[in-house]
């Protein structure tokens, strides 16, 4: 009886110990579970915060890039629009000439049919023709105020055209009708009214006209060496630009002629040396 009681008492103690141990273990586990859950939640929160920060940074970078590209495109478009508007304004401003000569009437009549005046333009002259020769020819038609041959500034040679100033318009008309087409020094000259009344800036080139069949080969070769390819259609547009047509440029040409005659030798020479100018002058007026 005593043995069975002791055995039962031992079983009870072991059960109680196991219960207490299980209870103690369950208490420990119960104590440790909230700490672990808290650490997991903290790690999740930190991860979510880091993700949100990275996402916000990437979003801010994207937005800044978009804003930068938009601002650059806007600035470029603004610059382009400003440059276009500036170029348009510049074209509008400079489309019309602001020179004081543009508002004035520079020509008397048109190039095809100039109005009659006292100044005649003589074109297609030879290099050997002088102002004295022209005066002898045109003085038959009336009193002459002055005769001016236009010379090149660099070479000091005749540019192949001159201006004859009459005192009367009627005499100029008669001289134009009679002397136009006349052969002078082996050249068939052209005579017409001058359309300019003020001098122009000289341009390089010599108007020599068209040689006639009676001129010698040496003279043709000499004259062609200074010809710049002018034809009869350009005698207004090019010849007048170089000479100071019709009412102010003849004095400068006369001064240049005097200086050229005083300082430089005579241009009438040939390949063999100096050639005297004692040649017979003959001009044939136009037959009616």
Swiss-Prot record:
Phosphorylated in the RS domains. CDD domains: RRM_TRA2 (cd12363). It is found in: Nucleus. SUPFAM superfamilies: RNA-binding domain, RBD. The modification Phosphoserine is found at residues 2, 4, 14, 29, 83, 85, 87, 95, 97, 99, 215, 237. One of its GO terms (cellular component) is nucleus. SMART domains: RRM. GO terms for biological process: cellular response to glucose stimulus; cerebral cortex regionalization; embryonic brain development; mRNA splicing, via spliceosome; positive regulation of mRNA splicing, via spliceosome; regulation of alternative mRNA splicing, via spliceosome; regulation of RNA splicing; RNA splicing, via transesterification reactions. GO terms for molecular function: identical protein binding; mRNA binding; pre-mRNA binding; protein domain specific binding; RNA binding. InterPro entries: Nucleotide-bd_a/b_plait_sf (IPR012677), RBD_domain_sf (IPR035979), RBM (IPR050441), RRM_dom (IPR000504). The modification Phosphothreonine is found at residues 33, 103, 201, 203. Highest expression in heart, skeletal muscle and pancreas. Less abundant in kidney, placenta and brain. Lowest expression in kidney and liver. There is a cross-link at residue 197 (Glycyl lysine isopeptide (Lys-Gly) (interchain with G-Cter in SUMO2)). The modification Asymmetric dimethylarginine is found at residue 241. The keyword Protein transport does not apply. The modification Omega-N-methylarginine is found at residue 241. Found in a pre-mRNA exonic splicing enhancer (ESE) complex with TRA2B/SFRS10, SNRNP70, SNRPA1 and SRRM1. Binds to A3 enhancer proteins SFRS4, SFRS5, SFRS6 and SFRS9. Interacts with CPSF6, RBMY1A1, RBMX, RNPS1 and phosphorylated SFRS13A. Interacts with SAFB/SAFB1. Interacts with ILDR1 (via C-terminus) and ILDR2. Sequence-specific RNA-binding protein which participates in the control of pre-mRNA splicing. Can either activate or suppress exon inclusion. Acts additively with RBMX to promote exon 7 inclusion of the survival motor neuron SMN2. Activates the splicing of MAPT/Tau exon 10. Alters pre-mRNA splicing patterns by antagonizing the effects of splicing regulators, like RBMX. Binds to the AG-rich SE2 domain in the SMN exon 7 RNA. Binds to pre-mRNA. Belongs to the splicing factor SR family. This is Transformer-2 protein homolog beta. The gene is TRA2B.
């Amino acid at each position: 009886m005593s043995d069975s009681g002791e055995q039962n008492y031992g079983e009870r103690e072991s059960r109680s110990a196991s219960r207490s141990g299980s209870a103690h273990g369950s208490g420990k586990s119960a104590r440790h579970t909230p700490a672990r859950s808290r650490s997991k939640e903290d790690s999740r929160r930190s991860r979510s915060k880091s993700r949100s920060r990275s996402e916000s940074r990437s979003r801010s970078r994207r937005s800044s890039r978009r804003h930068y590209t938009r601002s650059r495109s806007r600035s470029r478009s603004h610059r382009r629009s400003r440059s276009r508007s500036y170029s348009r304004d510049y074209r509008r401003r400079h489309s019309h000439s602001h020179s004081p000569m543009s508002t004035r009437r520079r020509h008397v009549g048109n190039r095809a049919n100039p109005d009659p005046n006292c100044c005649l333009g003589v074109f297609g002259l030879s290099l050997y023709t002088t102002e004295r020769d022209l005066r002898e020819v045109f003085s038959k038609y009336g009193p002459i105020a002055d005769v001016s041959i236009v010379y090149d500034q660099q070479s000091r040679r005749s540019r192949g055209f001159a201006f004859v100033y009459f005192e009367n318009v009627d005499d100029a008309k008669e001289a134009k009708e009679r002397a136009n087409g006349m052969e002078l020094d082996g050249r068939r000259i052209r005579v017409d009214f001058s359309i300019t009344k003020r001098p122009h800036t000289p341009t390089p080139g010599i108007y020599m006209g068209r040689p006639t069949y009676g001129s010698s080969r040496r003279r043709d070769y000499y004259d062609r060496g200074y010809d710049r390819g002018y034809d009869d259609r350009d005698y207004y547009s090019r010849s007048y630009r170089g000479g100071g047509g019709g009412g102010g440029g003849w004095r400068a040409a006369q001064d240049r002629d005097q200086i050229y005659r005083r300082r430089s030798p005579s241009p009438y020479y040939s390949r063999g040396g100096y050639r005297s100018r004692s040649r017979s002058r003959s001009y044939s007026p136009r037959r009616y």
